[in-house]
Amino acid sequence: MADIVIIGGCGHVGLPLGLAFAKAGRKVVALDIDAEKVASTNAGKMPFIDAGADELLLEVRKSKKFECTLDASVISTADVVITVIGTPLDEHLNPRLEVYQDLLSKDRSRLRSGQLLIMRSTVYPGTTEHVAHALKSAGFDVDVAFCPERVAQGVALEEIHSLPQIVSGTSERAIARATELFKLLTPDIILLPTVGAELTKLYNNTWRYIQFAVANQFYMIANDYGLDFYDIHHAMTEKYPRARGFPKAGFAAGPCLFKDAMQLACFDNNAFFLGHSAMLVNEGLPNYLVRRAAQKYDLRNLTVGILGMTFKADCDDPRDSLAFKLRKSLKFECKEVLAADPYLDKPWIVSPEELVERSGLIFVGTPHSAYKKLNLKGKPVIDCWKSLPGGMTVV
C-alpha cells in the first residue's frame, strides 16, 4: 500500500520528486521498467547525480518511506499516481501521444476510481484534457491534474522546494487535491488552466532555447569576422543590467529544450519561426565548428579529441548531447577521433590525459569543471564555451 506511486520513478524527474515526498512523510513507491535502476535505488545508491539525493535516499530507505518496484500492480494501491511520462517527438518532429495508451486503456490500465492522477512531465498542449476525457470514457472516476516540473538536472531536489509549483486540473477537486499535496514541498503555488500550464512549461524551455540560439548566432557572427565573442559579451553585460541574463555560447542540447521548442512549433501549426530558427542555429553549431576547423587544420591527417560528451557540464546524462553530433562530423573529416568524459562509461572513452597526448587538435564538447586543471600541453583547443585557460574562442 502506498500514498503515492510515481510512474517512471527512477529517472531524473521522478526520483527526486519521490524522495522529496518521502522526506515529507508520505509513503512513496517508484515504479520503473529499468531493473538495474530499481535494484540500485533499492540498495540505496542513486543511479545519477543530484545534489543532496545520496544522503536523502539512504534516509528514506531506512525509514521505509520509499521503495522502487517493477510491478505495475502497485498503481492500484495508491491514492495518488504521478506520471513522469512526457510526449516525445517522432522522426517527423510530431508529438507522440500514444505513450499514454497503456495508462488509458480500459483493459490494461491499473488506475481505479477515486485516485488523483498527476501528469508531471512536459506534454503537448491539450494532453491533460485528452487524458481526463479518455479515462472518463473508459469508466474511471479519476481526478486529473497537470503539475509540471521545471527543475534543472543535478539540482532537482533543491529546486523542487525553491521554485513555485504550477498547479492545474480538469476539475476543482483535482486542483484542490493537487494543491494540498504540493504544499508539502513548497508554499508557492500558481494556479492556471490546464492548457495554460502546459504552455508555461513549453514557454519556459523554449525561451531558454531561443536565448542560447541568440548567443550562438552572435558567437558565429563575431567569429566569422575574427573577433572574440567573449570580449564583446563582457562589454555587453558588464555593469549593464539590461543584458545581465545574456548567456554564453555553447551547445544547447539535452532531453528537453529542442523537444519542447519543436512541440510548441507543432502546436502553432509550424508557424513558430523563432523556434525553428533557434533549432537551426543550435543544431548547426557543431558542424559550424568543424567547418571552421577544416579551413585552418588538415583534419584528414589529424587525430582529434573531444573533451566532454554529456549534454551539460558536470552532469552524467548523455541524452541528446550535441557532443555526439560533433563526434559524428569529426569522424567523417578526421583521421581518428578520441573522446573523454568522467561521467560516461563507454568502450570508446579514453582518459583526458591520453586524449591530450594523442590529439593534434582538441574540441571542448562539454565544459566539465574537472578539465580546468588539465595540462593541455600547448595543444590547440577549440572552446566555444571559453571554459579552459588557453582555449581558442576564435576559430
Language-model-detected regions and their locations in the chain:
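Structural/interface elements that position substrates and couple domains in central-metabolism enzymes
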Residues: 1-395
